[in-house]
């Protein structure tokens, strides 16, 4: 799995954890090990520009995903996973920090960035949360992936509750 994490934000983040949880999420979703993903960490000004340009919405947001090859997990266990360019995930640590502090289960900026990384991966794989049933499916997968990764890394306590809506 080729995953690049590029921190352009000026904020210190746990890039290794972002890389690790992205790799874990893609493995859990059975994406081909030769697929490629890029994660870019930006400041609020850059995120706001992207949010306006691509979503026509004001202000910065926490995470944006830009799919390339529209890879999907294999439908069957014996099916060969697809290979290709997943696309880009853009994260904003300043927004993540605020969301982590304001969440019902307060957590760190890095924990929020881990959650948002999984959220971005799921968007790249075609998951969405516009409709209630889609939201339940996506957030259920997101929680299972984050919990699984935390368990494998010996992290205890409750996983961050979803802060993206």
From Swiss-Prot:
It is found in: Cytoplasm. Keywords: Cytoplasm, Endonuclease, Hydrolase, Metal-binding, Nuclease, Ribosome biogenesis, rRNA processing, Zinc. It holds the Pfam family YbeY. Binds 1 zinc ion. Its EC number is 3.1.-.-. This is Endoribonuclease YbeY. Single strand-specific metallo-endoribonuclease involved in late-stage 70S ribosome quality control and in maturation of the 3' terminus of the 16S rRNA. The keyword Thylakoid does not apply. PANTHER family: ENDORIBONUCLEASE YBEY, CHLOROPLASTIC. It comes from the Bacteria. Its cofactor is Zn(2+). Zn(2+) binds at residues 119, 123, 129. It comes from Streptomyces griseus subsp. griseus (strain JCM 4626 / CBS 651.72 / NBRC 13350 / KCC S-0626 / ISP 5235). GO terms for molecular function: metalloendopeptidase activity; RNA endonuclease activity; zinc ion binding. GO terms for cellular component: cytoplasm.
